[in-house]
């Protein structure tokens, strides 16, 4: 890589990076990371892995379809019918394509898919080999090449997307935003993102203590074959509690039992060993207790040995297990066969499912028991369910693979059924017709569209909310949504443990960004530099270990295990090694050279427990760290210099990893490294804190996620405030994407004059917050002025608002399509006329053009018609003279929302997937800040606008500066958002200095004292206070006031969208009470608590009015004799109660309609409520 003379320029000492140099150097390293990876790389890589590896693997793993007709006994001699074998082989994926109605394929661009409500998917083809075997003839092989089997939705910006690798200019020509990160799908025109799902890691042994159950301790192993369709099979090894109901009068002591898959009862552990073929006690103990010099442990196993004393042979043990199976066999042979199957295929499948894996399984089972005993003896800590090393994240790849596997299985089933029909009739079948392509296409589309992850027919078992509509409110909310993690624990559970911030989340998951309320701590977000492993094959590592003198389990004597180190690969025990130190060094060296071992593999050496664990599986969360050797960074100046020139010399992050100065460390391995926070810690001091550092953080601010990285000085705020801002930053208005004018989003807010903040963090440049900001630098004073800013409200400058301060535009799209309901009902876009059209509302239809659509530029207000559409009324058979019907059509137009007004911005007419006419109309309205709108600073300080004063009524400084916003001093002390104040100071300095201020967290170079000194250099008060003059009187305000520029955001909650009142309006059909909700012009509920207040006041008439007259007044006629509602004909004034034959003694009772309904419903249940009139 370097020439000899190039090396000469750097001396050994010269090349070291000093702490001062590091202030800038670390950001060069971080920039190179983001240049290469971007922010959604984990989504894209996972999807690419699915397309390139998983699909092919799933197709190859499927067994060939073997078909044969029933033998025909027609002509005396039995002729063996031909056998057909179908094998699916190589797969091919084409570019995303769309077939028009005329059948011509054309490449589909993502924006076209969004606008026309199509699915952005690519066709999948497969080679099928069909073999015909006839008796006495040689085999006939036919190749069906590239048979279409379905469409797979494509993730935007992944390798197979049409946008992959295009320049910014090309993207703009395709109406795509160059800043859009991709990482989502387009299904029926809406953008869907797959949320990473958390799960416990498979194939690892966990030991937990059990509370209040018959077991004291339980060891479990969720065992699952890599890349197989089998569901995980879990095996539990448990130790019974002392003197519990399980221990037989506790004479025997604590027994150990195993719970096997498909076996109903628990089986004593020793019997399982005997069933595996280890009969003598010594053999079994050797596999459990490696060291016989351990009396305590021997004592623990003794009760289990005594219990299984009765059963001494393998077959007896197998019979014992088989007879407890799900459906026990009739004969002994069948039972034994069943037990053998369970032990071979279902117990610990990851160790092996082929024959002769008994030794390995016995060792693994023994290891599980050993772990259980260690925990029971208190020699090893129990496992932690919430440790992030024990968790795996299922991203798009594994999630889609799970779905595709199920769909493909169904496809094969259908092919088999179809082909068998033809073969039974003695005909050949057509493969193209046998393959139902809709199974895969619709199956994947259904799950991505609804978020129910699984088969459509079993929707109730499926996980909900795996796929969500991508949040497009602000650019930051989009990025954050693409990096979200979800724990599938019931939201209603009151468990605090899984919700708490675990130590192992440091650097992997953002500590601040999590929703408030019932999902707190269950929904998390990735930290900025965290990456999720894609998974790689363990085979090269296994081969390497074989060469490097690892002893295989089958070849060793059990006695050797006690002193050696066990080696696990992906949770499976593969062997032992005598020299772990050297092995680990070699493995690490290989990983750093990226030779044999991929950089995302993690290697953990647990010295205390004498174990080496190697993980290559997918879904481990890891992050890059700098490698330290001999207390010096391996990263040198020359690397930094090359990175600075990376645009010209192609030296990138990948080269940095390849040259072995950075490596990826996952959560488990992080616990075995010694981490320096800054290179400053590596300096030799008099009192060294530690002299064995192995790694160093790149920059501590990288522990934060997307939304928390926007906060200036988050290390000066009380922690919940950062959490609040992380949630509010997702609701701020800005420019959410640069191509918003060509998109037809259902809802969109765009700020008129967004500004980049004066005070920024260094992380912001990777979030593109400077290019797509969401807020304005406002002059903010902290004062109580006229008292219109109490309780978190703010006073705004009316004149600034008139000049465009925080003005925004709001877009809403309406869509409608013509579709054919039946053969005689068809929908048409047209302008309905009152002569021929039934059911027209009292609305203005005049604004429509003749084609039924409104023209752009027309001003519309609530309940105006935007899209005119009619549907033909079906002709009734009984009408003979149907020619002179008055109405032939029914109106089913689309109206503007009642509470909105605006101007039609854009009208789009096109054809949708079925070839029907389809239109989208976008209406825009200008939103000017007004009293009641919500604003917030970047520190969780939210407030609504309390009043707006003209500029001349606002206070002013001697320089003539008036604040845009005045907030109340009471907002600061109890909330301790000191970052807010420092930001204001820093902003003041920046405005004077003319350069952007740095507010990156954990940065010792910036502190309040330094900022204050700079401020006083510019002739201001040290702490930012100024003398203000009252705007009403012009007099000096007695106290000095803190004033300066602070970045404020306008949030999406606006008073226009929420204002609601009702006098009269629609009522519900069932109980005749007012409807609910603003959109339906509903009433306001007078609830139980309000009722109680009125009772306490004794306001009886008011109570009657609210709960009766203003709600659902009704009157019924009641028979005075039996108290049940009577028949009343109010026109003829005749009343009767048939049961009592009473026509005279009837009273009129007024009651709420809901009460009458309740009485009648009770009557339908044979309960007769009688209303006796007094």
Swiss-Prot record:
Sites binding DNA template strand sit at 456, 1078, 1085
GO-annotated biological processes: transcription by RNA polymerase II
Q: Where does RNA bind?
A: 731, 841, 890, 942
Signal peptide range: none
Sites bearing Phosphoserine, chain numbering: 937
Q: Residues that bind Mg(2+), according to the entry? A: 792
What's this chain's function?
Catalytic core component of RNA polymerase II (Pol II), a DNA-dependent RNA polymerase which synthesizes mRNA precursors and many functional non-coding RNAs using the four ribonucleoside triphosphates as substrates. Pol II-mediated transcription cycle proceeds through transcription initiation, transcription elongation and transcription termination stages.
Protein's UniProt name? DNA-directed RNA polymerase II subunit RPB2
Source species of the chain: Mus musculus
């Amino acid at each position: 890589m370097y020439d000899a003379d190039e090396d000469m320029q750097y001396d050994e000492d010269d090349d070291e990076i000093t702490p001062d140099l590091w202030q800038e150097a670390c950001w060069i390293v971080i920039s190179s990371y983001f240049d290469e990876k971007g922010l959604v790389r984990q989504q894209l890589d996972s999807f690419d892995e699915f397309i390139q590896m998983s699909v092919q693997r799933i197709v190859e793993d499927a067994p060939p379809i073997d078909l044969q007709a029933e033998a025909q006994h027609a002509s005396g001699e039995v002729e063996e019918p031909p056998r057909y074998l179908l094998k699916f082989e190589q797969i091919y994926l084409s570019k995303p394509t769309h077939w028009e109605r005329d059948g011509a394929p054309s490449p589909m661009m993502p924006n076209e898919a969004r606008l026309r409500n199509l699915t952005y998917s690519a066709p999948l083809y497969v080679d099928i080999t069909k073999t015909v075997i006839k008796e006495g003839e040689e085999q006939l092989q036919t190749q069906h090449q590239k048979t279409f089997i379905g469409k797979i939705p494509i993730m935007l910006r992944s390798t197979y997307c049409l946008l992959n690798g295009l320049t910014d200019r090309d993207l703009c020509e395709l109406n795509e935003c160059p800043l859009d990160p991709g990482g989502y799908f387009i299904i029926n025109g809406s953008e869907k993102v797959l949320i990473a799902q958390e799960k416990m890691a498979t194939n690892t042994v966990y030991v937990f203590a059990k509370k209040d159950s018959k077991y004291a301790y339980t060891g479990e192993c969720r065992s699952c074959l890599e890349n197989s369709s089998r569901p995980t099979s879990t095996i539990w090894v448990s130790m019974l509690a002392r003197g519990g109901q399980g221990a037989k009068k506790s004479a025997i002591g604590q027994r150990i039992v195993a719970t096997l898959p498909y076996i109903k009862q628990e089986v004593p552990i020793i019997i399982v060993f005997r069933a595996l073929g280890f009969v003598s006690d010594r053999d079994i103990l050797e596999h459990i207790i490696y060291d016989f010099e351990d009396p305590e442990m021997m004592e623990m196993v003794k009760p289990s040995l005594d219990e299984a004393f009765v059963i001494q042979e393998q077959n007896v043990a197998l019979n014992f297990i088989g007879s407890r199976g799900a459906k026990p066999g009739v004969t002994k042979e069948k039972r034994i066969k069943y037990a053998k199957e369970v032990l071979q295929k279902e117990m610990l499948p990851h160790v092996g499912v082929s024959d002769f894996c008994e030794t390995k399984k016995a060792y693994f089972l023994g290891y599980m028991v050993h772990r259980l005993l260690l925990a029971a003896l208190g020699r090893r800590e129990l496992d932690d369910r919430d440790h992030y090393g024990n968790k795996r994240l299922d991203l798009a790849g594994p999630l889609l693979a799970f779905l595709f596997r199920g769909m493909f299985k169904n496809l094969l089933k259908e092919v088999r059924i179809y082909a068998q029909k033809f073969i039974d009739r003695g005909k050949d079948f057509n493969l193209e017709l046998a393959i139902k392509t809709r199974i895969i296409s619709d199956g994947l589309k259904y799950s991505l569209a609804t978020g129910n992850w699984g088969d459509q027919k079993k929707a109730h078992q499926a996980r909900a909310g795996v796929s969500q509509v991508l949040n497009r409110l602000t650019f930051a909310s989009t990025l954050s949504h693409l990096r979200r993690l979800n724990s599938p624990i019931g939201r209603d559970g009151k468990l605090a443990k899984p919700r708490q911030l675990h130590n192992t989340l440091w650097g992997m998951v953002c500590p601040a960004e999590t929703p408030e309320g019932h999902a707190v701590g269950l929904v998390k977000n990735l930290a900025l530099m965290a990456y999720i492993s894609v998974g790689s094959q363990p085979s090269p590592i296994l081969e390497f270990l074989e060469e490097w003198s690892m002893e295989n389990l089958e070849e060793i004597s059990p006695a050797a295990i006690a002193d050696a180190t066990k080696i696990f690969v992906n949770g499976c025990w593969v062997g032992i090694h005598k020299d772990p130190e050297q092995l680990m060094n070699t493995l690490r060296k290989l990983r750093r050279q990226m030779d044999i071992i991929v950089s995302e593999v993690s290697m953990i050496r647990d010295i205390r427990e004498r174990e080496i664990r190697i993980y290559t599986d997918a879904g481990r969360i890891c992050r890059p760290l700098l490698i330290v050797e001999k207390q010096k960074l391996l990263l040198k100046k020359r690397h930094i210099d090359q990175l600075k020139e990376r645009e010209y010399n192609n030296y990138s992050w990948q080269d940095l990893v390849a040259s072995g100065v950075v490596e990826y460390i996952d959560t488990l391995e992080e616990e075995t490294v010694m981490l320096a926070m800054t290179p400053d810690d590596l300096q030799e001091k008099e009192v060294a804190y530690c002299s064995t550092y192995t790694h160093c953080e790149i920059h501590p601010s990288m522990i934060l996620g997307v939304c928390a990285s926007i906060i200036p000085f988050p290390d000066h705020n009380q922690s919940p405030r950062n959490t609040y801002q992380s949630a509010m930053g997702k609701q701020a208005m800005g420019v959410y994407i640069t191509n918003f004018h060509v998109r037809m989003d259902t809802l969109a807010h765009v700020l008129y004059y967004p500004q980049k903040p004066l005070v920024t963090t260094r992380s912001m440049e990777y979030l593109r917050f400077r290019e797509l900001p969401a807020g304005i630098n406002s002059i903010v004073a902290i004062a109580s002025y006229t008292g219109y800013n109490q309780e978190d409200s703010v006073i705004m400058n009316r004149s600034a608002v008139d000049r465009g301060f925080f003005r925004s535009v709001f877009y809403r799209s309406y869509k409608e399509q013509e579709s054919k309901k039946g053969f005689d009902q068809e929908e048409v876009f047209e302008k309905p006329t009152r002569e021929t059209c039934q059911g027209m509302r009292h609305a203005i239809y005049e604004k429509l053009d003749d084609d039924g659509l409104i023209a752009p530029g027309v001003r519309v207000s609530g309940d105006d018609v935007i899209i005119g559409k009619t549907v033909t009324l079906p002709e009734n058979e009984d009408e003979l003279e149907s020619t002179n019907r008055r109405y032939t059509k029914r109106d089913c137009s689309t109206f503007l929302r009642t509470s909105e007004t605006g101007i039609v911005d854009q009208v789009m007419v096109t054809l949708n997937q079925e070839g029907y006419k389809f239109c989208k109309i976008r209406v825009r309205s200008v939103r000017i800040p007004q009293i009641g709108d919500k604003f917030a600073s970047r520190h969780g300080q939210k407030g609504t606008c309390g009043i707006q004063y003209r500029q001349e009524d606002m206070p002013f400084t001697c320089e003539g500066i008036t604040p845009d916003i005045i907030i109340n001093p009471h907002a600061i002390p109890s909330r301790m958002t000191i970052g807010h104040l420092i930001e204001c100071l820093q902003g003041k300095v920046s405005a004077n200095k003319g350069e952007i201020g740095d507010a990156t967290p954990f940065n010792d170079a910036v502190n309040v004292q330094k900022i204050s000194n700079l401020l006083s250099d510019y002739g201001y008060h040290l702490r930012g206070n100024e003398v203000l003059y009252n705007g009403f009187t012009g007099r000096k305000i007695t106290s000095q006031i803190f004033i300066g520029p602070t970045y404020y955001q306008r949030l999406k909650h606006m008073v226009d969208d929420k204002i609601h009142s009702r006098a009269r309006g629609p009522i519900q059909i069932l109980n005749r009470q007012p409807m609910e909700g603003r959109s339906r012009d509903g009433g306001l509920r007078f609830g139980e608590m309000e009722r109680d207040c009125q009772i306490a006041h004794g306001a009886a008439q008011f109570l009657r009015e609210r709960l009766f007259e203003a709600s659902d007044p009704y009157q019924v006629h009641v028979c005075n004799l039996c108290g049940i509602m009577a028949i009343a004909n109010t026109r003829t004034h005749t009343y009767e109660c048939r049961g009592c034959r009473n026509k005279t003694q009837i009273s009129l009772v007024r009651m709420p309609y809901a009460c009458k309904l309740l009485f009648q419903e009770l009557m339908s249940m044979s309960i007769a409520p009688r209303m006796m009139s007094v």
